[in-house]
Amino acid sequence: MTNFKCISLLLAIVLVSLILNPTFAHNPKHNRPPRDPKDCPPPIPKKPKPPRDPKDCPPPQEPKQDPPPPEEPKQEPPPPKEPTQDPPEEPKIVTPSNEPEKPTPFHNLYIGYFSIVIAFGDSYTDTGNAQYMGSITITTTESSSSPYGSTTFGKKSNRLSDGRLVIDFITDALGLPTLPPYKETKANFDNGVNFAIAGATTLANDLFSKLKRIFLWKGTPLGIMTELDWYKKYQIDQLCKGLDQKACAEKLKTVLFWVGEIGINDFSRAVGSKIPLSSIAKSSVTYTVELVRTLIRNGAKNIVVQGLPPLGCLPLDISITPLSLRDRSGCSQIVNAAVVIHNQILQAKLELYRKLFPDVTIIYADSWKAFYAIRNNPQKYKIQEVNKTCCGFKQDDMNFNLQSLCGASGTSICDDPSKYISWDGIHPTESMNYHMTDQYINHQCCNPPFQELMKKKAPK
């Protein structure tokens, strides 16, 4: 009985348990006591990604924020461009009353490197000596209605062109006023002087007076040695006045000596005569070389010497050269062959002087190369006429007649001189002078390069 009671009690306990937890009997896997969250965490379902802790890992990768790129120079508005690149306005040039107020790309390009320019040469460089001495015929520059100087100066300019010469562009590049002619009595020579004489020759004056080829000049032409005599006097009386030898030598370092084309008149007067042009070439260059040597002996340290352009391409020489003696481009073969001889001798002599006087900078300005660079590619320079003259006798070939030169009765002026190489059949237009200067300064038509003049000097 007692056993029966015990068994009945045990069964009652089991029955109560089944009623309270019915799943216990059906799923043996769950025959475990329920988890207490304090004792252990719930099982991790197939490695779910744990939530990010901002302290432990980076935020979701926004476009990769690598180390911030080095700050590009803060893109503030770009700085104003240097004045050399298209300035908004061209500065006004302060010029003496006798100068044109027309700025050029050369203006002040090398300002401060030289304080004085002294020039020699012929009508391609003369700014008034021949005019002041009365050695130019009346049809050129004496009349107030003269076409000479009309493009730039608008009045008598004392220049044998419609405007500026190469030497005018050179002084403009150096930031200096135009050069007054030595024969202008009231001129200020503080920044230089021009000794060039239109019509000047290198050979004996009486030789050419016998040939009776006067062209634009009256009487017997003066020689290049006259210019040298003027310079010697000027150096003593003005340039180095009151200075001892050392101080004079120092002052001469600030001077640029410009020796323009010399010999053009020798060739022009001799063409068609019995004098061989090759002899003229060899003889005339001797005087140019002597001029350079004398300048060096007198203390010159910076010298530019212009060679001759192809004179056989001037309307003057073409007009007196038979067709059979002209080359394919219409130029005089004989004249140009002689010019080549002249230039070769001149360059060889200058090279010798560079070796003998290493402290002197001697530049050869290659006028032959510069001229052909322009003539052979006229469209590039907006030139339409390479053989015709702008101012001359329209009824003749090339608008040129030796008996009716520019300014004479019956002559006329072209509408736009900038489209012509030749102004009057002998002298270049201002436009051509500008392009020649550009070739010297910017296009390797100087040997050594024009910039060599500035290497030994610092602008003041």
Regions found by a protein language model. Give the residues of each.
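Conserved active-site regions of diverse hydrolases
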Residues: 2-38, 46, 82, 86, ...
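Long, intrinsically disordered low-complexity tandem-repeat segments
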Residues: 33-92
